[in-house]
UniProtKB/Swiss-Prot annotation:
The lineage of its organism: Bacteria, Pseudomonadati, Pseudomonadota, Gammaproteobacteria, Enterobacterales. This is Crotonobetainyl-CoA reductase. It is found in: Cytoplasm. Keywords: Cytoplasm, FAD, Flavoprotein, Oxidoreductase. Signal peptide: none annotated. It comes from Shigella flexneri serotype 5b (strain 8401). SUPFAM superfamilies: Acyl-CoA dehydrogenase C-terminal domain-like, Acyl-CoA dehydrogenase NM domain-like.
């Protein structure tokens, strides 16, 4: 596996560097984080570069650049301080619809290309069904030629502003043998109530509770095939976990570089603190973790481009990178001392964001379970 970037990939990365140097994005990110506001202006700038077309097939007007290119772009964005967690639907969200959606649904989502606006997200988690997705209670029932959606979802990302969501629900007419199906829901429909929740980190992307009270749908609003709900989201879950891991690496690399520059400049006891062995030890451990993350992610991206990536690979990336990145940021914060925990240094935002990522997108514990099963399955 050769992970040297080709000319096209180098151009993308160079474009990212140019964009990030074009203005004081950090001040904008800090404001959006403080106010829990989606950074639409920044996402629009990325969309203008074609980032939202990276994985779209050429026959649909996309670049079909592949996952290694995506990884290189994501890592560089994160290294330069961008909140890449707000972009999870940007590269893969269109492909989900190209794979599962009707032409009408595809047209509605593809209209968001190049806009930078939030377009859709999945609504699966419920108050009583987090990791145990088989315990979903939200139902769809058929009455008089219509579909009626009832129940509630919680911790649903992007749902404060997104115009559409894809809701996982069970057939209310089949209580003994659950049938799970996804539905494409226009958020402007009557009977939908959205309550925004406050959270520790990842504050630039909304997190909401959504209730459905006899929300009326049509058969054409079915997303994918009836009864195929869990199968259709499996690839989406794996894709999300890979993107979370890429975000973790980029954020950790940014914190590492901030701390390294500080260690070489901060003078105590007559010399730069970077000359002290205990500080050097921290950087040695951070560098080992960062290098391990990077190699793991590029291998996973290569597998994705060659059609060999598995759910176990995605779980390994998600678990290792979420934990290693948090440890790197925590160590970097220790190096920064009071500067890192007081005032407005971005490392405090990184610390909060990475702590959330050990829960969101699949908890640490669920990644370990998924990976353990995948490993043992190879030896049956």
């Amino acid at each position: 596996m050769d992970f040297n970037l080709n000319d096209e990939q180098e151009l993308f990365v160079a474009g990212i560097r140019e964009l990030m140097a074009s203005e004081n994005w950090e001040a904008y990110f800090a404001e959006c984080d403080r106010d829990s506001v989606y950074p639409e202006r920044f996402v629009k700038a990325l969309a203008d570069m074609g980032i939202d077309s990276l994985l779209i097939p050429e026959e649909h007007g996309g670049l079909d650049a592949g996952f290694v290119t995506l990884a290189a772009v994501w890592m560089e964005l994160g290294r330069l301080g961008a909140p890449t967690y707000v972009l999870y639907q940007l590269p893969g969200g269109f492909n989900t619809f190209l794979r599962e959606g009707t032409q009408e649904q595809i047209d509605k989502i593809m209209a968001f290309r190049g806009t930078g606006k939030q377009m859709w997200n999945s609504a699966i988690t419920e108050p009583g069904a987090g990791s145990d997705v088989g315990s979903l209670k939200t139902t769809y029932t058929r009455r008089n030629g219509k579909i009626y959606l009832n129940g509630s979802k919680c911790f649903i990302t992007s749902s404060a502003y997104t115009p559409y969501i894809v809701v996982m629900a069970r057939d209310g007419a089949s209580p003994d043998k659950p049938v799970y199906t996804e539905w494409f829901v226009d958020m402007s429909k009557p009977g939908i109530k959205v309550t925004k929740l406050e959270k520790l980190g990842l504050r630039m992307d909304s997190c909401c509770e959504i209730t459905f009270d006899d929300v009326e749908l049509d058969e054409k609003d079915m997303f994918g095939r009836e009864g195929n709900g869990f199968n259709s989201v499996k690839e989406e879950f794996d894709h999300e976990r890979f993107l979370v891991a890429l975000t973790n690496y980029g954020t950790a690399m940014c914190a590492f570089e901030d701390a390294a520059r500080y260690a070489n400049q901060r003078v105590q006891f007559g010399e730069a603190i970077g000359r002290f062995q205990l500080i050097q030890e921290k950087f040695a451990h951070m560098a080992i973790k960062l290098n391990s993350m990077k190699n793991m992610l590029y291998e996973a991206a290569w597998k994705a481009d060659n059609g060999t990536i598995t759910s176990g690979d995605a779980a390994m990336c998600k678990y290792f990178c979420a934990n290693a990145a948090f440890e790197v940021v925590d160590s970097a914060m220790q190096v920064l001392g009071g500067v890192g925990i007081a005032g407005n240094h971005r490392i405090s935002r990184f610390w909060r964001d990475l702590r959330v990522d050990r829960v969101s997108g699949g908890s640490d514990e669920m990644q370990i379970l998924t990976l353990g099963r995948a490993v043992l399955k190879q030896y049956r």
